[in-house]
């Protein structure tokens, strides 16, 4: 019985982490897509300092973090 309960407790966090990683990819993909439309042809670079950490956080927190990062994000574009 202890082995079964251990497997159940291990599988539950794995399911929640996979859900949060999928949702964070969607959020970051949308924000990066909108930025690339604005400056995609300029060959500019965009910095996402916390992009790797967003996969751990839930979708609601990701939206808040992405909005906060967009205010401090530095854009560098070659064409003005």
Curated annotation (Swiss-Prot):
Residues covered by region (Disordered): 1-29
InterPro entries in the record: HssA/B-like_chaperone, HssA/B-related
Pfam families (UniProt xref): Coiled
Domain of life of the organism encoding this protein: Eukaryota
Bias (Low complexity): 9-29
GO biological process, one term: sorocarp development
Family in the record: Belongs to the hssA/B family.
PANTHER family, per database record: HSSA/B-LIKE PROTEIN 1-RELATED-RELATED (PTHR31059), HSSA_B-LIKE PROTEIN 1-RELATED (PTHR31059:SF5)
Protein name per its UniProtKB record: HssA/B-like protein 2
Species of origin: Dictyostelium discoideum
Gene giving rise to this polypeptide: hssl2
């Amino acid at each position: 019985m202890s082995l079964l309960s251990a497997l159940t407790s291990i599988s539950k966090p794995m399911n929640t982490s996979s859900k949060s990683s999928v949702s964070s990819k969607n959020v970051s993909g949308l924000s990066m897509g909108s930025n690339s439309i604005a400056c995609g042809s300029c060959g500019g670079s965009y910095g996402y300092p916390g992009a790797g950490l967003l996969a751990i956080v839930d979708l609601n927190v990701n939206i808040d973090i992405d909005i906060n990062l967009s205010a401090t994000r530095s854009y560098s574009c070659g064409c003005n």
